[in-house]
């Protein structure tokens, strides 16, 4: 019985050895240390590392030749050295004394990563600033050349072959003159010049002297009434209600006399129409360049042919 008890007591350490794995009871579990190492950095820690940004979007200022930029501290190389150190696995017995140092290991890795990114951005900003300095330097150095910039398109000299004489149609357009006044008798010159007019309200209403008189003397109401009362589409009595040469002259004048009792402004239509004719004649006399004679003889004036000039440079 004692032998069995001893053998039973002696088998307990054999069963405990694989469970302990050569680790003492006071030592921490290495898996806990690994879980402590792998953790995510917070935003406060990242901001504490990089509180300023070296890259700027604003324009760079050209440094003066007498001043030299101050050298920057070489903190990036220190972080790169920390990043370049080989990682060795430590025995589990020494991990409980370096828990705090292992917790800072990801922090150093992030520092090296940020430093490498900032180094690339610093190179980019340095290259861009150097290119801008070259451009600015070239613009400053080319100051006297700016006075010789050509701002007007140069004109080439005319060659004799490029000078074309006027055609016969252009010469004979104003060749027919009046025998009495000596002015041109072509269609363009003898056409009567009307008073100026213009479209208003997005080209919906024509503003002219005739329309002003029609709306001012209420003749537009008479024209509308005659338009709706006429049966013939070809009847133009609505356009000229006071005409004596068209049909239904007595009927129209009687209707206008009755309407003038309710619209007294109709009495001003005939005087306003006479003033319009007078203004039209004065405007035509001033602006018409052609002949205004009714019965006159036409004389054809020949335009003398002028030989072309020689634009060659004298030798």
UniProtKB/Swiss-Prot annotation:
PTM info: Cleaved at Pro-144 by the prolyl endopeptidase FAP (seprase) activity (in vitro).
Keywords: Cell membrane, Cell projection, Cytoplasm, Cytoskeleton, Developmental protein, Disease variant, Membrane, Microtubule
Positions of transmembrane segments: none
Region (Required for interaction with CAV1): 118-315
Disordered, as annotated region: 1-39, 51-140
Xref: InterPro entries: Sprouty (IPR007875), Sprouty_domain (IPR051192)
Subcellular location field: Cytoplasm, Cytoskeleton; Cell projection, Ruffle membrane
Domain SPR: 177-291
Site-annotated residues for Cleavage: 144-145
UniProt GO cellular component terms: actin cytoskeleton; cytoskeleton; cytosol; membrane; microtubule cytoskeleton; microtubule end; nucleus; plasma membrane
Record carries keyword Zinc-finger: no
Substitution effect: residue 119 to W: In IGAN3; no effect on protein expression; negatively regulates ERK1 and ERK2 cascade
Region (Required for interaction with TESK1): 178-315
Feature: compositional bias, Low complexity: 108-140
Bias type Polar residues, positions: 1-15
Principal subcellular localization: cytoplasm
A single GO molecular function term of this UniProt record: protein serine/threonine kinase activator activity
GO biological process terms, semicolon-separated: animal organ development; bud elongation involved in lung branching; cell fate commitment; cellular response to leukemia inhibitory factor; cellular response to vascular endothelial growth factor stimulus; ERK1 and ERK2 cascade; establishment of mitotic spindle orientation; fibroblast growth factor receptor signaling pathway
One Pfam family of this chain: Sprouty
Biased composition (Basic and acidic residues): 20-32
Notes concerning its domains: The Cys-rich domain is responsible for the localization of the protein to the membrane ruffles.
Function: Antagonist of fibroblast growth factor (FGF) pathways via inhibition of FGF-mediated phosphorylation of ERK1/2. Thereby acts as an antagonist of FGF-induced retinal lens fiber differentiation, may inhibit limb bud outgrowth and may negatively modulate respiratory organogenesis. Inhibits TGFB-induced epithelial-to-mesenchymal transition in retinal lens epithelial cells. Inhibits CBL/C-CBL-mediated EGFR ubiquitination.
Recorded disease: IgA nephropathy 3: A form of IgA nephropathy, a common primary glomerulonephritis characterized by glomerular sclerosis, interstitial fibrosis, and mesangial glomerular deposits of immunoglobulin A and immunoglobulin G visible on renal biopsies. IgA nephropathy is associated with renal insufficiency that can progress to end-stage renal disease. Proteinuria and hematuria are characteristic clinical presentations.
Assembly: Forms heterodimers with SPRY1. Forms a tripartite complex containing GAB1, METTL13 and SPRY2. Within the complex interacts with METTL13. Interacts with RAF1. Interacts (via C-terminus) with TESK1 (via C-terminus); the interaction disrupts SPRY2 interaction with GRB2, potentially via disruption of SPRY2 serine dephosphorylation. Interacts with PPP2R1A/PP2A-A and PPP2CA/PP2A-C; the interaction with PPP2CA/PP2A-C is inhibited by interaction with TESK1, possibly by vesicular sequestration of SPRY2.
Family that this chain belongs to: Belongs to the sprouty family.
Protein name in the entry: Protein sprouty homolog 2
Naturally occurring in which organism (per UniProt): Homo sapiens (Human)
Upper taxonomic lineage: Eukaryota, Metazoa, Chordata, Craniata, Vertebrata
